[in-house]
């Protein structure tokens, strides 16, 4: 079993935005290995932090790591999409700060048996929650050519989505595709040789697409962001770290709607819709990792940090 470690991305920037030293209730909606939570708890002199994660192994590892903080921390197994109801069960209806660090964790990538990595031989799984029914095996071996093309194109932004889908369907007709490395090889040889030699691993985009489909990562992200916004007390801050353009676009558009909700014709002399801003965007441009962080944590390469403050 791989040790559950977590190098928190842009920790200093996150803490500066959330300012947990203010006290009150904070939420880490994507607990993972607990790196960000530990940073928050060290500054949280008066208050409590709730950590949410659907991965049971993450809950266990983070709970052990954060045990020294005692009752200041409580882990909740669940999906941050359900944050409002999960916290309502704890009697919490308003919070001072929320962090969402989207995407797959280093532990999930580095644990071969979880099936997230194209570098290691493993069963096709990719479930962040092992209680879920849908796995990568089901997607790869059960989805139609059209469905595969759609998710690989839309969720992976893969230029050769149709070619990759055709190769998957052709190979699975011979025998089921049941391992990560077999799938990675199929993808690799479906992509033109000239393109295989450029950039990251040729399977990266397709694996991302399948993972997003299995875990429903984008299906209700906008709704989840709005629910988290509603939980914030006036003056409360939400910080969100994204890892690809699909996530970032959803977060950016949601934040913009909080700051500029007016639906009137832009040419209208005055606003008549009556919709008022509910939050201020604190990051006019997304914050990205600095050179030093990229050196010691190369997985932070594609990350972007955005934040809002509730009015």
Task: Give a label for each model feature.
Residues 1-311:
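S-adenosyl-L-methionine-dependent methyltransferase catalytic core, i.e., the SAM/SAH-binding region
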């Amino acid at each position: 079993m791989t040790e559950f470690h977590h190098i928190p991305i842009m920790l200093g920037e996150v803490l500066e935005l959330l300012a947990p030293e203010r006290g009150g209730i904070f939420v880490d909606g994507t607990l993972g290995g607990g790196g960000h939570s530990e940073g928050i708890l060290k500054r949280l002199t008066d208050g409590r932090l709730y950590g949410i994660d659907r991965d049971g192994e993450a809950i266990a590892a983070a709970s052990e790591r954060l045990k020294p903080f005692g009752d200041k921390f409580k882990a909740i197994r669940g999906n941050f999409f359900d944050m409002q109801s999960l916290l309502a069960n704890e009697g919490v209806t308003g919070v001072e700060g929320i962090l969402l660090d989207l995407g797959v964790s280093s532990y999930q990538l580095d644990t071969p048996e979880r099936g997230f990595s194209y570098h290691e031989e493993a069963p096709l799984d990719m479930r962040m929650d092992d209680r879920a029914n849908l796995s990568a095996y089901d997607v790869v071996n059960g989805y139609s050519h059209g469905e595969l093309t759609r998710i690989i194109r839309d969720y992976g932004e893969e230029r050769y989505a149709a070619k990759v889908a055709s190769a998957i369907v052709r190979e699975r007709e011979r025998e089921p595709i049941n391992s990560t490395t077999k799938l990675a090889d199929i993808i690799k040889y479906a992509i033109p040789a000239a393109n295989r030699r450029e950039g990251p691993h040729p399977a990266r985009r397709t694996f991302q697409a399948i993972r997003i489909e299995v875990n429903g990562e984008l299906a209700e992200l906008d709704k989840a962001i709005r629910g988290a916004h509603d939980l914030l007390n006036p003056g409360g801050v939400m910080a969100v770290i994204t890892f690809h353009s699909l996530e970032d676009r959803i977060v950016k558009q949601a934040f913009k709607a909080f700051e500029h909700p007016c639906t009137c014709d832009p040419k209208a002399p005055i606003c008549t819709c009556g919709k008022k801003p509910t939050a201020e965007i604190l990051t006019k441009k997304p914050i990205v990792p600095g050179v030093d962080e990229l050196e010691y944590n190369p997985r932070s390469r594609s990350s972007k940090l955005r934040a809002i403050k509730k009015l």
